[in-house]
Structure formats: structure tokens, C-alpha cells
């Protein structure tokens, strides 16, 4: 009997045993994922064991909020960024820029970040321990609700649950003993309403909650100082003199705004248009926690869509208007509820729950992107910011929030920044950041205008004359109208000018303000900005959780069910053994995969195929290609699908085509493998003829 016949018989015996393994349908997979409860510790063990990421500077004890990505984590992040770039930049014809991370003080002072980019912190005056106020209130009230549940007999041991939760969250502080105390129903309702709105409280309001509900140091019970603002930006000095103060950027947006005129010119002065930027940003978090979810250095992908403030329609809105999403609008939250409303995007915009078509369009596109990269649709909602929760620059904002074992996490923001940024930078630099639209039909426009008697400015205001003049020439129409009334009534008015001490008085000899009607052939306006902003690290971690499950037949066998598009490695190439006759085929298949630019790994270790597949299931590798002794004979290989463990067989060329179609062309497993032969049936037939 020839070597190949012996090998064939040997392989068939292996396959006969493998026939007993259940091949799973899509429904089977869903049931299997639901059958085994999610275990965060097990996920983190897999992620760190397979070096998706690890604490930075671990040998030196690490630094809270800083992480390094290993090879699979780096590849996964790159694949998500590549998908993002194609989904947004290429599809929407956006203009990509890469701006510096170092930002001068004046830029961020003008944008409002120096004064307003803060979280609320409170300090234990005895120990010096610092807490983030909203997190502290949330943690204490949640603990009291758990104690109430134990007192009512709804849970067996609230302390065990709390300790388990603290361990999972890797908190270094101890968990104060939770007392099983039954709360009044009204108090329970109050706590639940507070927790539903926890992101919307100001510092003074958090202080009032801490005082009202006797919230102090959760370990010692000591009273804490009142919450105070802590600016989250990392300060630095630019240059050797140390005179030029700067910051590591807290967002990529400012670089895009400051390059607006160049971008508009590059786009042949056509609007609307969008710029985009992908890069690192930095925030000096008060209490980094929850792994990749709250860190001090993170990757962002941001879009600035510049649009006419009088026309926020979108030409492609009809393409997405029928998409149904879960919305959590402001009024629902104000009522103390967290139950989302399911509506189509078209209905949300028509009812003005979502302000305009462009904002609605990008919310829908965010949804489509998140679905593409592996987010669980049932764990996605769009929550509207409360009025006092919005960033200082935002007119409206919706967060794409993903549910994880840590709760609902803000991963994407979609804000209408109105014309705030361009307006403040234009006012500060005296450089117009506007769109000039040629009008088909000239229009008559009546405006307030101010005339200055400049020859009197120098003697009266001396060195401050340029500042006063600049302030007057940049006054809004409303300001000019009010000053005109004062000038008419009193013959004078006063103003406050940046950089000038006290109030500046001007009379009718120095200025004249009147309405004038002109015919305009060009409309000049500051565009509004719709900004989708993605926290890539938070999205990555959420996809980790949404993709993780254990096989019901063996809970120790973990799987990361990444979509093939974003999986770090697409193919595990598995020679059946280290026999020299399999080397040429393995080399040939590797060469074709490399030429096809399909990321792969060869595992020719001596362990069983099952173990090799299992450890790559933990890496999220969607396909396994097995090279056996039949492959050496007829150049056919077996293709295995990760989640269902289904296997098919065909020529090397057809198998690689199937991998490419499923990974990059959006084909399903059934569509991609329709020309391949189910492996088990073939193997059984072979076994019977031997």
C-alpha cells in the first residue's frame, strides 16, 4: 500500500472522530452565546494572555490609564481604522488632514478648553485621596440600591456581588461593607432617577447630592471637600525657553477648524464638505478605570462636516431614513427613565427629536459602521445630551452608547457645534473663516454699520486704540442695534474690551451707528459644523465584549467572533503534521495568501489540530485552512469557519477566493463557499470506501 493511501486512511480516521463534533447553524451560535454567562475576568485573561493589550510600563509597576497594544490588538485597531476610513472618508469624499498634537495655549483658550474642559473632583482633606464626583455619587447610590435589594430578598449577598464587581473593575481601594438596609420606595425611585441623569449634573449640583445623601469617602466615611473643576488637559512648554505655553491636544478638531480656509480652497470653495482626522488625543483623567474605556491617551477619529446653517438637509438622507434606531431623547431622561424609543431616522428628524437631516444622516452612518465592525445591535443606543451636560461648544449632541459589563459607555459623539469654533477663532485672529456664496439673484440687505472717527481714537485711547477699534468692528448686529439705541438716547455708551482695563466710553463724536440698505451679490456666512467623533479604544473594547463567548460543550474554550473584515488575522494555515511532503503545499498556499494580501499565520506546532484551532479562536481568526496529505496529492485544502466549525473542501484557488469574498466583499459563508464541497460528507464517503 502506498504512503498516500496509508495517510489517507489515517486522516479519514481522524475525520470519523471529528464527525461527532456538532456543526453549528447561525441559530445554534446565537443560542450557544446566550447559554454561557459573560465572564469579564475570562475575557481579560484572553486579551492579556494573547497580548491584545497590556498595561504600559508594566515592569515599573505601570501607570494608570496608559496601555500598549500587542500584535493582535494593533492589527485589530488598524483594521477598524481602515474600515472607518473607507466607510466615511472614501464614501463621503471627505478631506483627510493630519495635524500636530501640540497646541499653543492661545488656541485652546480661544476654543474654550482652557476654561471649560473639566471634570468635577473632590478631595479627602485627611488622606489626600481624590475622587471624581459623578463617579463617586454613582458608586455610592448603586451600593445602597444593592443593599436594599438584599434587604428585600432579591439578592443573596450584596457584599459578595460588590466585591466581585470591584475585583472585575480592578479597583485598588477596598469596598466598604454594604449594609442590607431596606430603603423607602420613594428613596429608591429618587436614587434611580439620579442615576439615570448622572452625566447631567454640574459641580454644585453634585455637591448638593453629596450633602443631601451623606456621601463621603466610600472607605472611611470621612466628609469630602465640595467638588471643584479639574482641567483635563496635559500642560507642556513648547521650546527651550519655556515661554510658549501649550497643551497636548484634547481632540483633533481644532486643527481642522484652523485649516478651514485652506480646506475650503482645496474643495474649490464648494459646500457642504467635510474634513476628517485620525490621531492621538490626551486627557488627564481624574480616576482612570475600566481598562481601555477610560484612559489618558487614546486614538480618535473625528469628522467636521461644514454645512450652510440655513440648509441642513442632506442629499443622501433618503438612503438611510428607514433605518430603525434606539433613541434615548432628553425629555425621557428628564422624566427619570432610561427606556429607549425605537424610531426610524426619518421619523426622528420629521418630529424634530433629531434636529436636522445632516445630523440624522450621520447618526445612521455611525450605526452602519458599528454594525460592520461587530457591535451587537441590541447593545447600541443613541442618547441625547442633557442641556447642562453638553460640551461648551455644542448646540445639540447625541452619543452612540454601547452596553458593556461596565454599563452604557459613550463611544461615539455626534454633535452640532453650530458656528462656535470658526466664529471664536475668526474673532480672535481677525481672519475671516467664512463661505462666500455667489447669489443667482442679488438681494437687498439692511444691516447696522458703524463708522469710526479714527483721527480721534489715537489721542483718546492711545496704545489701546487698535484693541477698541477691533472690538467695535467685530460687534454683532444685535450689539450694534442696542448700542445705536443708547447712542441715540444718551449720546454715548460703554463697552468692555479684552486687554483694556475698566470700561471704555464712546460718544457720538467718536462713532456713528446707523442702518443701511445695500444690494448684495454674494452671501457671506459662517458654516455650522456637524461633528461625529469616535473614541476608537472604547469601540475596540466594546467589540471585544460583544464578540466574546465560550463553547457550551467546553467553557474553557473561548471564542472572539470578530467579523472577518476587522479580525487581526484572517487565516490560520495548519499543516496536518510536520512531514516534509506537506512543506511545498504549505509554502505555496502561504505565497498565494501573501500575494492576495490576506493576513495569515502558519501554526505547524506539534500539538493537535483541535488545540491549534482553539487558541486561534481566542485570537478571533475567522478561517482555518488545513493542509493534509490529500493536499500534497491534488492541491485541495479544507476551509474551517470559526464560529460554526463548519468545514468545506476545494482547490487552493477556490478556497482563497471564498476567503476573499467573505472577508472583503461582504459575502456570507453560504454565498462564499457555494462552489466548495462540505467536508464531513466527503470524509465519510472516503472512510466508507477505504
Swiss-Prot record:
Organism domain of life:
Eukaryota
User: To which protein family does this belong?
Assistant: Belongs to the class-II aminoacyl-tRNA synthetase family.
Task: Name the InterPro entries for this protein.
Answer: aa-tRNA-synth_II, aa-tRNA-synth_II/BPL/LPL, Anticodon-bd, Anticodon-bd_dom_sf, Gly-tRNA_synthase/POLG2, GlyRS-like_core, tRNA-synt_gly
Per its record, the protein catalyses: tRNA(Gly) + glycine + ATP = glycyl-tRNA(Gly) + AMP + diphosphate; 2 ATP + H(+) = P(1),P(4)-bis(5'-adenosyl) tetraphosphate + diphosphate
Q: What is this protein called?
A: Glycine--tRNA ligase 1, mitochondrial
Write the lineage as a comma-separated list.
Eukaryota, Fungi, Dikarya, Ascomycota, Saccharomycotina
> How does this chain assemble?
Homodimer.
Q: Which GO terms describe its cellular component?
A: cytoplasm; mitochondrial matrix; mitochondrion
The miscellaneous remark of the record is: Present with 98400 molecules/cell in log phase SD medium.
Q: What does this protein do?
A: Catalyzes the ATP-dependent ligation of glycine to the 3'-end of its cognate tRNA, via the formation of an aminoacyl-adenylate intermediate (Gly-AMP). Also produces diadenosine tetraphosphate (Ap4A), a universal pleiotropic signaling molecule needed for cell regulation pathways, by direct condensation of 2 ATPs. Thereby, may play a special role in Ap4A homeostasis.
Q: Which UniProt keywords apply?
A: Acetylation, Aminoacyl-tRNA synthetase, ATP-binding, Cytoplasm, Ligase, Mitochondrion, Nucleotide-binding, Phosphoprotein, Protein biosynthesis, Transferase, Transit peptide
Q: Which residues carry this modification: Phosphothreonine?
A: 689
Q: Which residues bind ATP?
A: 283-285, 294-295, 410-411, 538
**Tell me, what is an example of a GO biological process annotation in this record?**
mitochondrial glycyl-tRNA aminoacylation
Q: Which PROSITE patterns match?
A: AA_TRNA_LIGASE_II
Which positions make up the signal peptide?
none
SUPFAM superfamilies (UniProt xref): Class II aaRS ABD-related (SSF52954), Class II aaRS and biotin synthetases (SSF55681)
Which residues does the Swiss-Prot or TrEMBL entry list as transit peptide?
1-24
Amino acid at each position: 500500500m502506498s504512503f498516500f493511501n496509508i495517510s489517507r486512511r489515517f486522516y479519514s480516521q481522524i475525520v470519523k472522530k471529528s464527525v461527532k463534533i456538532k456543526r453549528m447553524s447561525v441559530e445554534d451560535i446565537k443560542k450557544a452565546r446566550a447559554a454561557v454567562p459573560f465572564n469579564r475576568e475570562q475575557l481579560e485573561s484572553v486579551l492579556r494572555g494573547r497580548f491584545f493589550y497590556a498595561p504600559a510600563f508594566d515592569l515599573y509597576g505601570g501607570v494608570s490609564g496608559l496601555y500598549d497594544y500587542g500584535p493582535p490588538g494593533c492589527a485589530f485597531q488598524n483594521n477598524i481604522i481602515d474600515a472607518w476610513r473607507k466607510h466615511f472618508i472614501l464614501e463621503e469624499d471627505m478631506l483627510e488632514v493630519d495635524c500636530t498634537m501640540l497646541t499653543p495655549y492661545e488656541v485652546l483658550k480661544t476654543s474654550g478648553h482652557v476654561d471649560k474642559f473639566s471634570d468635577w473632583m473632590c478631595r479627602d482633606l485627611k488622606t489626600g485621596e481624590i475622587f471624581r464626583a459623578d463617579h463617586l455619587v454613582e458608586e455610592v447610590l448603586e451600593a445602597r440600591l444593592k443593599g436594599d435589594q438584599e434587604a428585600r430578598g432579591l439578592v443573596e449577598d450584596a457584599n459578595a456581588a460588590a466585591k466581585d464587581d470591584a475585583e472585575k473593575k480592578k479597583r485598588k481601594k477596598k469596598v466598604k461593607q454594604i449594609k442590607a438596609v431596606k430603603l423607602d420606595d420613594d428613596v429608591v425611585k429618587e436614587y434611580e432617577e439620579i442615576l439615570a441623569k448622572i452625566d447631567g449634573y454640574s459641580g454644585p449640583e453634585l455637591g448638593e447630592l453629596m450633602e443631601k445623601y451623606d456621601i463621603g469617602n466610600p472607605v472611611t466615611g470621612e466628609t469630602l471637600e465640595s467638588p471643584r473643576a479639574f482641567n483635563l488637559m496635559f500642560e507642556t512648554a513648547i521650546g527651550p525657553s519655556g515661554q510658549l505655553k501649550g497643551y497636548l491636544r484634547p481632540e483633533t478638531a481644532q486643527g481642522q477648524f484652523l485649516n478651514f480656509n485652506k480646506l475650503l480652497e482645496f474643495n474649490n470653495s464648494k459646500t457642504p464638505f467635510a474634513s476628517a482626522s485620525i490621531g492621538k488625543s490626551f486627557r488627564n483623567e481624574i480616576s482612570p478605570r475600566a481598562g481601555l474605556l477610560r484612559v489618558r491617551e487614546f486614538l480618535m477619529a473625528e469628522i467636521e462636516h461644514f454645512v450652510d446653517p440655513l440648509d441642513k438637509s442632506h442629499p443622501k438622507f433618503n438612503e438611510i431614513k428607514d433605518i430603525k434606531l434606539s433613541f434615548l431623547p432628553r425629555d425621557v431622561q428628564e422624566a427619570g427613565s432610561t427606556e429607549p424609543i425605537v424610531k426610524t431616522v426619518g421619523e426622528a428628524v420629521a418630529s424634530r427629536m433629531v434636529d436636522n437631516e445632516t445630523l440624522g444622516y450621520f447618526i445612521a452612518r455611525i450605526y452602519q459602521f458599528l454594525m460592520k465592525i461587530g457591535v451587537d445591535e441590541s447593545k447600541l443606543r443613541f442618547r441625547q445630551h442633557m442641556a447642562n451636560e453638553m460640551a461648551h461648544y455644542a448646540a445639540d449632541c447625541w452619543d452612540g452608547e454601547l452596553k458593556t459589563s461596565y454599563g452604557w459607555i459613550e463611544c461615539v459623539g455626534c454633535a452640532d457645534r453650530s458656528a462656535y469654533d470658526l466664529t471664536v477663532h475668526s474673532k480672535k485672529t481677525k481672519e475671516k473663516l467664512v463661505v462666500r456664496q455667489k447669489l443667482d439673484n442679488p438681494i437687498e440687505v439692511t444691516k447696522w454699520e458703524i463708522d469710526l472717527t479714527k483721527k480721534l481714537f489715537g489721542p483718546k485711547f492711545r496704545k489701546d486704540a487698535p484693541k477698541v477699534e477691533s472690538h467695535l468692528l467685530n460687534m454683532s448686529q444685535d450689539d450694534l442695534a442696542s448700542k445705536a439705541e443708547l447712542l441715540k438716547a444718551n449720546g454715548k455708551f460703554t463697552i468692555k474690551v479684552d486687554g483694556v482695563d475698566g470700561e471704555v466710553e464712546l460718544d457720538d463724536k467718536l462713532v456713528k451707528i446707523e442702518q443701511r440698505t445695500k444690494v448684495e451679490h454674494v452671501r457671506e456666512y459662517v458654516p455650522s459644523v456637524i461633528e461625529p467623533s469616535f473614541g476608537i479604544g472604547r469601540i475596540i473594547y466594546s467589540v471585544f465584549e460583544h464578540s466574546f463567548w465560550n463553547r457550551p460543550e467546553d467553557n474553557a474554550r473561548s471564542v472572539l467572533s470578530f467579523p472577518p473584515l476587522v479580525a487581526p488575522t484572517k487565516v490560520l494555515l495548519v499543516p496536518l503534521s510536520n512531514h516534509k511532503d506537506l512543506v511545498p503545499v504549505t509554502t505555496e498556499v502561504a505565497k498565494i495568501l501573501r500575494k492576495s494580501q490576506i493576513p495569515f499565520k502558519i501554526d505547524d506546532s506539534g500539538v493537535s489540530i483541535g488545540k491549534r484551532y482553539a487558541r486561534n479562536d481566542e485570537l478571533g481568526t475567522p478561517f482555518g485552512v488545513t493542509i493534509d496529505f490529500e493536499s500534497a496529492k491534488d492541491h485541495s485544502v479544507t476551509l474551517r469557519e470559526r464560529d460554526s466549525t463548519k468545514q468545506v473542501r476545494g482547490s487552493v484557488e477556490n478556497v482563497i477566493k471564498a476567503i476573499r469574498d467573505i472577508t472583503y466583499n461582504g459575502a456570507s459563508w453560504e454565498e462564499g463557499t457555494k462552489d466548495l464541497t462540505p467536508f464531513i460528507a466527503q470524509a465519510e464517503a472516503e472512510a466508507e470506501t477505504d
